[in-house]
């Protein structure tokens, strides 16, 4: 509102002017700029590396994580390591993992890592905040090789001792890369045609694993009692229906291929029994 008043006085004109507007404040505040809140970026797990991609139970594997963080020194981050089996030794970004005897094998195990960053929040709420990230390592192939090799040997010989099990089924755990697979199939076919096993006993004696971890040797004390069902012409020592027993050591070899153990060959070392010399092979040694 503006008010003007003219005061006459000998040719002098005075003007009184008051300026303003209804309801306005002479000093209105400007817009308020909120404080800038710093953004804390989460840690980044760049890699998790194991000292071995294949391991035996009750041996240590070193697991190392490479982690970076823009705000917090990596040594101040919290690292939590987990696996479906085994224990961890150490702390921080590098630990040792050991799987116990009795863990299921052969199997693939992945190591899981949780990294936690705790920091002070620079906002109106204040207090501590957390960034949590998870990562998983490439799998580690775990074995209990002596047990696996012993199980393969006993399973094969147990199938051989059961005359109702086909030759093809008996050799399912033999490697295609070993000539022993074809030889063993022919031997079992011969046995099935000429004998019926009526009793057996098997006892695992020894298992050794090669220094390179790629070969194995097994010895099983074996005893088979069988009845002759067919004789070849000219075999004067053979009598259909005769029952006899062969006993000695069944010696087997194995190879490691395609991330597992396979049988490679099987041979019998024992005394020959008249009429049963061809029990294990059509070409007895």
Question: Residue ranges of each PLM-predicted region?
Answer:
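Solvent-exposed loop segments of extracellular immunoglobulin-like
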Residues: 73-80
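Short solvent-exposed beta->alpha transition segments
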Residues: 167-222
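Exposed beta-sheet edge and beta->alpha loop/turn motif
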Residues: 213-285
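Short, low-complexity N-terminal intrinsically disordered segments enriched in polar/charged residues
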Residues: 135-162, 172
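Proline-centered linker/hinge motifs at extracellular inter-domain junctions
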Residues: 43-44, 149, 261
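Extracellular acidic, Ser/Thr/Pro-rich low-complexity tracts
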Residues: 67-72, 117
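Bacterial Sec-dependent N-terminal signal peptides
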Residues: 16-47, 52, 137
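Surface-exposed, flexible coil segments in extracellular/virion-facing regions
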Residues: 82-98
């Amino acid at each position: 509102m503006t008010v003007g008043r003219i005061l006459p006085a000998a040719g002098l004109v005075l003007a009184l002017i008051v300026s303003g507007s209804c309801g306005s404040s002479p000093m209105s505040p400007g817009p308020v700029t909120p404080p800038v809140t710093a953004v804390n970026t989460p840690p980044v797990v760049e890699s998790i590396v194991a000292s071995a991609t294949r391991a035996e139970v009750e041996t240590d594997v070193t697991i190392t994580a490479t982690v970076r963080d823009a705000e917090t020194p990596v040594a101040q981050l919290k690292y939590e390591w987990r696996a479906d089996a085994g224990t961890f030794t150490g702390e921080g970004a590098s630990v040792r993992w050991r799987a116990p005897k009795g863990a299921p094998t052969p199997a693939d195990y992945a190591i899981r890592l949780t990294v936690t960053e705790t920091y002070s929040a620079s906002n109106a709420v204040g207090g501590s905040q957390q960034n949590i990230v998870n990562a998983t390592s490439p799998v580690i192939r775990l074995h209990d090789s002596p047990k696996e090799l012993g199980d393969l040997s006993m399973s094969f010989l147990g199938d051989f001792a059961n005359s109702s099990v086909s030759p093809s089924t008996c050799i399912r755990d033999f490697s295609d890369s070993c000539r022993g697979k074809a030889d063993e199939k022919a031997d079992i076919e011969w046995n099935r045609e000429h004998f019926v096993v009526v009793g057996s006993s098997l006892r695992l004696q020894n298992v050794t694993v090669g220094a390179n971890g790629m070969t194995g040797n097994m010895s099983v004390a074996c005893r088979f009692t069988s009845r002759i069902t067919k004789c070849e012409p000219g075999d004067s020592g053979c009598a259909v229906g005769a029952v006899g027993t062969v006993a000695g050591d069944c010696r087997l070899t194995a190879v490691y291929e395609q991330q597992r153990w396979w049988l490679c060959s099987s041979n019998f070392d024992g005394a020959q029994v008249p009429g049963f010399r061809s029990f294990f092979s059509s070409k007895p040694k």
